Design a protein with these regions (language model features):
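Short coil-to-beta microelement around the adenine-binding A-loop and adjacent beta1/P-loop entry
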Residues: 16-17, 74
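Short beta-strand immediately N-terminal to the Walker A/P-loop
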Residues: 32-33, 82
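The feature captures the beta-strand-to-loop junction immediately N-terminal to the Walker
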Residues: 35-37
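Helix-to-loop junction immediately C-terminal to a conserved catalytic motif
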Residues: 50
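ATP-binding/catalytic-site motifs of ATP-hydrolyzing domains
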Residues: 59-61, 65-66
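ABC ATPase NBD coupling module
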Residues: 66-87, 112, 126-130
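Short coil-to-helix segment of the ABC ATPase nucleotide-binding domain corresponding to the Q-loop/switch region
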Residues: 92-100, 126
Length: 134
């Protein structure tokens, strides 16, 4: 079973059909990159998956649990998350402190090693202030 499964997803901005029948599966532990030029629908796809943008049709399941049509908070509870593009960080906190802000309910206040394994540049810059990053 796929950790994330998307079948025939359709999203619109008003009457403009912007995501057409998108279908894909992501296995547990798999890393996926969504790439494309500006305006190709990368952010729109992610906003559709997390529920920020409503979809008109299609199925989204997380670990076998249907989440299409559910509110954003229910999708987060199912294990989904979304980090928007741009500088949506605290500029006066370090990179490490910015990462830790998302770990408020965790008793061990250290950045998990898997984050640095997947994104080694974060480890190299963990002491830099977020506002100083380019």
């Amino acid at each position: 079973m796929a950790m994330l499964s998307v079948k025939a997803l359709n999203t619109y901005y008003g009457e403009s059909h912007v995501i057409r029948n998108a279908s894909f599966d992501v296995a547990e532990g798999e890393t996926v990159a969504i790439m494309g030029r500006n305006g190709m629908g990368k952010s729109t796809l992610l906003k559709s998956l997390i529920g920020i943008l409503p979809t008109r049709s299609g199925d989204i399941t997380v670990a076998g649990r249907a989440v299409a049509g559910t509110p954003t908070y229910a999708r987060v509870a199912a294990g989904m998350g979304f980090v928007p593009q741009g500088r949506m960080i605290f500029p006066y906190l370090t990179v490490e402190e910015n990462i830790l802000t998302g770990m408020e309910n965790v008793t061990d206040k250290t950045v998990p090693s898997y984050i640095y394994n997947v994104f080694p540049v974060l480890n190299e810059m963990k002491s830099r202030r977020g506002g100083n990053l380019s």
